[in-house]
């Protein structure tokens, strides 16, 4: 446990290093910390902080810089978050509200990027959870059927399925009516769960068609999904700590393109409350060892459906980025919930 003197010096060091990117020496700490300490005492305290893993000494400088552990202590117990100005919040709200539903996710990603000058990312609501209004089957040939799905928000998805047997038009109408009458208002996951309970009530010849319809419906909805939108990746080219290592920078852009690892990280915030902060190696992704990820969940009608985040260097103004991510998540929730009600 650090004493108050050490905590004050660490806070001062982090703030100054974030501001100008240069290692912080004892003279600057003496000037800006507000502590009446001799240079020798400050050097001793800094040596203790370095031994404890909170700061490090670059080989080319007598000053020190924060480590990931130092940033973590700073964020957890030393940080004073700066509330956003009313004017800026108004501009953020205007950027998201009043747009077509399909543009809101992309706008949120661009908003995060433009405000932080890092990469902004949004995991979109999964379309598989769209509620179903109507399902129809249309025979194309003996064993090829067109599945037509109409969602509650008016989207229409089509999928061709191949069956093992020939279904008559009457059987297709019967199966479609059964699904529509019994499962309208549910998503495919809920329908699948209900059918596992009610499967005994179905005729044996209809059961395979129901299974095909569910699988095809899931696939059709997934294909029309853009689950991940990222903006401002090029901003990271201007971050000296990242751009100085081209190999690591290429790996970072590969991570953005592959998506799956980053999506899994961001989805962790879906099950947590408020803003989640991953500093350096805390992400569990080696490519992000020199980065921080700030993420928060957003909701539609009170249900968590995705997350927003900012990816940047560990040297970032956390007191500013954290509220930007938090407010963006809240405004996105409001904008999407409004769309779902209209």
UniProtKB/Swiss-Prot annotation:
<dbReference type="InterPro" id="IPR036390">
    <property type="entry name" value="WH_DNA-bd_sf"/>
</dbReference>
<dbReference type="InterPro" id="IPR029016">
    <property type="entry name" value="GAF-like_dom_sf"/>
</dbReference>
<dbReference type="InterPro" id="IPR005104">
    <property type="entry name" value="WHTH_HrcA_DNA-bd"/>
</dbReference>
<dbReference type="InterPro" id="IPR023120">
    <property type="entry name" value="WHTH_transcript_rep_HrcA_IDD"/>
</dbReference>
<dbReference type="GO" id="GO:0045892">
    <property type="term" value="P:negative regulation of DNA-templated transcription"/>
</dbReference>
<dbReference type="InterPro" id="IPR021153">
    <property type="entry name" value="HrcA_C"/>
</dbReference>
<dbReference type="InterPro" id="IPR002571">
    <property type="entry name" value="HrcA"/>
</dbReference>
<protein>
    <recommendedName>
        <fullName>Heat-inducible transcription repressor HrcA</fullName>
    </recommendedName>
</protein>
<keyword id="KW-0678">Repressor</keyword>
<dbReference type="GO" id="GO:0003677">
    <property type="term" value="F:DNA binding"/>
</dbReference>
<comment type="function">
    <text>Negative regulator of class I heat shock genes (grpE-dnaK-dnaJ and groELS operons). Prevents heat-shock induction of these operons.</text>
</comment>
<keyword id="KW-0805">Transcription regulation</keyword>
<keyword id="KW-0346">Stress response</keyword>
<comment type="similarity">
    <text>Belongs to the HrcA family.</text>
</comment>
<keyword id="KW-0804">Transcription</keyword>
<dbReference type="Pfam" id="PF03444">
    <property type="entry name" value="HrcA_DNA-bdg"/>
</dbReference>
<dbReference type="Pfam" id="PF01628">
    <property type="entry name" value="HrcA"/>
</dbReference>
<dbReference type="InterPro" id="IPR036388">
    <property type="entry name" value="WH-like_DNA-bd_sf"/>
</dbReference>
């Amino acid at each position: 446990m650090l004493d108050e003197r050490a905590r004050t010096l660490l806070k001062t060091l982090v703030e100054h290093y974030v501001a100008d990117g240069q290692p912080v020496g004892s003279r600057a700490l003496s000037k800006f910390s507000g502590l009446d300490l001799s240079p020798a005492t400050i050097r001793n305290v800094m040596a203790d902080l370095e031994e404890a893993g909170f700061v490090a000494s670059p080989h080319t400088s007598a000053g020190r810089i924060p480590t990931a552990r130092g940033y973590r202590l700073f964020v957890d117990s030393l940080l004073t978050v700066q509330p956003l100005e009313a004017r800026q919040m108004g501009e953020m709200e205007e950027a998201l509200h009043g747009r077509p539903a399909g543009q809101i996710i992309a706008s949120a990603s661009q908003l995060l990027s433009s405000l932080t000058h890092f990469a902004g990312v949004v995991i979109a609501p999964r379309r598989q959870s769209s509620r179903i209004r109507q399902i129809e089957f249309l025979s194309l040939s003996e064993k090829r059927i067109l599945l037509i799905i109409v969602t509650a928000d008016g989207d229409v998805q089509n999928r061709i399925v191949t069956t093992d047997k020939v279904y008559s038009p009457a059987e297709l109408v019967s199966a479609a009516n059964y699904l529509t009458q019994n499962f309208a208002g549910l998503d495919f996951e809920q329908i699948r769960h209900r059918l596992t309970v009610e499967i005994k009530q179905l005729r044996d010849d209809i059961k395979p068609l129901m299974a095909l319809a569910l699988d095809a419906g899931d696939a059709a909805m997934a294909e029309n999904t853009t689950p991940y939108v990222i903006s401002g990746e090029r901003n990271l080219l201007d971050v000296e700590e990242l751009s100085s290592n081209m190999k690591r920078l290429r790996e970072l852009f590969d991570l953005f393109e592959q998506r799956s690892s980053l999506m899994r990280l961001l989805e962790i915030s879906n099950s947590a409350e408020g803003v989640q902060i991953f500093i350096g190696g805390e992400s569990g992704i080696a490519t992000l060892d020199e980065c921080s990820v700030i993420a928060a969940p957003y909701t539609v009608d009170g249900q968590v459906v995705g997350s927003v985040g900012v990816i940047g260097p560990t040297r970032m103004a956390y007191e500013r980025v954290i509220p930007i991510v938090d407010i963006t998540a809240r405004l996105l929730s409001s904008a999407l919930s409004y769309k779902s009600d209209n």
